[in-house]
Each structure stands twice: as structure tokens, then as C-alpha cells.
């Protein structure tokens, strides 16, 4: 596998892969970088490189998210056993944009399919392979998620005439 293919994949898919990984972990850039490193060390390139990258990113992000949750639980237990030194600020959280919040409020399966299809450019067949479902189920999740997003964001989709 040549550096041209790797460079082209990074240029065209890295941003969407970061967005995809962000669903599960707080370090999506690291996960995507690790996925590209794994891709570069493959003796034989996968048949569908983009779908392969999404699979590796998904697995890595889920693992990183789980590790972060375990670390957070451990740190919370340790912090609960010591007296607090500071009063927490009431406005510690950052307000995200409305669309980002709406997307984050979707069920994970719907959010995953929407991000993979819109920003990742994956087909519903590739998404089905990635999520272990059928293409029709992936499409149903996509349509349902878009419907919820439209409702929450107040976006009206023009209807098509029925014959």
C-alpha cells in the first residue's frame, strides 16, 4: 500500500471519522490516528478501506469510552473519600450548539447511522455490516433519526407529491 492511498484517505475521511468516533469517546483524534496507523501497517489493504477504517475507529472509540468511564468511576470514588477544596462553579458546563445537542440526544444507533451515512459517505449496506444489522434496519434508523432531528430543530422537509 502506497503513501498516496493513505494520504488520500486521510484527506477525504479523517474529519468524518473524528466526528464518528466522538460519539463514544473524548479523544476521537487519537482513535482516528491509531486507525490510520493500523491501516498503514496492513500487509494487504482491506477490500473496502473506508468501511474498514470505520470499523476500527468504532471499536477503538467504544473501548476508549469504556476505559474513560472506568477511570471516571474510580476517580469519583477516590474523590468522594477526600474533603472538597473548592466549590464547583454553577456554569462549569459549556453550551453546545442546538444542532449538536439535538444530534447527541438521539439514540446511539440513530446517531451512528446518520453520522456514518451523511458525513462518512457509507452506504446503508456498509453501515449494516458495521453495526451487525440489515441495510433496511440501518435505513429505518436513519429515517427515524432524521425525523426526530427535523422535529427538534423545527425544520420542515418539503413533501413530494404522491401519485
Language-model features: locations:
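A short, charge-rich alpha-helical start-of-domain segment used by transcription regulators
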Residues: 1-29, 40, 44, 111
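Hydrophobic recognition helices of helix-based DNA-binding modules
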Residues: 17, 21, 39, 43, ...
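A short pre-motif secondary-structure segment
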Residues: 113-117
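Structural recognition of an alpha-helix C-terminal capping motif at a helix-to-coil junction
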Residues: 30-37, 47-59
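Helix-turn-helix DNA-binding module
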Residues: 104, 108, 120-140
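Short amphipathic alpha-helical boundary/capping segments
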Residues: 23, 98-107
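DNA-recognition helix of helix-turn-helix
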Residues: 48, 58, 62, 131-157
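Arg/Lys-rich amphipathic alpha helix in sigma70-family domain 2
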Residues: 55-77, 92
